[in-house]
Amino acid sequence: MSEYLLLLVGTVLVNNFVLVKFLGLCPFMGVSSKLESAIGMSMATTFVLTLASILSYLVDTYLLTPFDLSYLRTMAFILVIAVVVQFTEMLVQKTSAALHRALGIYLPLITTNCAVLGVALLNVNEKHDFIESAIYGFGAAVGFSIVLILFSAMRERLAAADVPAPFKGGAIAMITAGLMSLAFMGFTGLVN
């Protein structure tokens, strides 16, 4: 039980996919200008990452490995992710049309979010079992969500702040992301 908790904490805080592994930077920078859309994107990404991790594990364990088709792993995982994203898009469209409009193009772009594919591939490379794969996917999603929501809240405050002209827009966003990354480095000694 404690190894599962360590895996979760390590994935969320210590080995954060955005700030440490630099995966998922496109939605991190693209959707983080408004807190409302960042929260919606976080929920959608959490659902997709967790479900894609579980399904990718099942596809790899029960289809690719037994038939010695590991060379198709990346394509199979991309197909699984695309199916999960389509399902998520239909679910979001049915439950919240406003959120679907707010997320716009970013919802289908979860398919190309390298964090989702990265989690699926790292699950296989680190030889996680079913429960560890689910925890790893959920932890990566929670870490992504925390960083995205914190960053969007800071960007909303920066939009109202008196920022010098050369630093407006993307420049101050990158500086803020760097400072956030430094803050998360404080968690490095938390999990061995």
UniProtKB/Swiss-Prot annotation:
Gene Ontology biological process terms, A to Z: electron transport chain
> Top-level EC class, please?
translocase
Subunit composition and interactions: The complex is composed of six subunits: RnfA, RnfB, RnfC, RnfD, RnfE and RnfG.
Q: What stretches pass through the bilayer?
A: 5-25, 39-59, 72-92, 102-122, 134-154, 171-191
- Pfam family name, one: Rnf-Nqr
Protein topology in the membrane: Multi-pass membrane protein
Role according to the record: Part of a membrane-bound complex that couples electron transfer with translocation of ions across the membrane.
E.C. number, please?
7.-.-.-
What's the protein name?
A: Ion-translocating oxidoreductase complex subunit A
| Major subcellular location class | membrane
Q: Where in the cell is it found?
A: Cell inner membrane
Organism classification: Bacteria, Pseudomonadati, Pseudomonadota, Gammaproteobacteria, Alteromonadales
| Statement: the UniProt record of this protein carries the keyword S-adenosyl-L-methionine | no
Q: Which family does it belong to?
A: Belongs to the NqrDE/RnfAE family.
Keywords, A to Z, come to: Cell inner membrane, Cell membrane, Electron transport, Membrane, Translocase, Transmembrane, Transmembrane helix, Transport
- Cellular component, GO, one term: plasma membrane
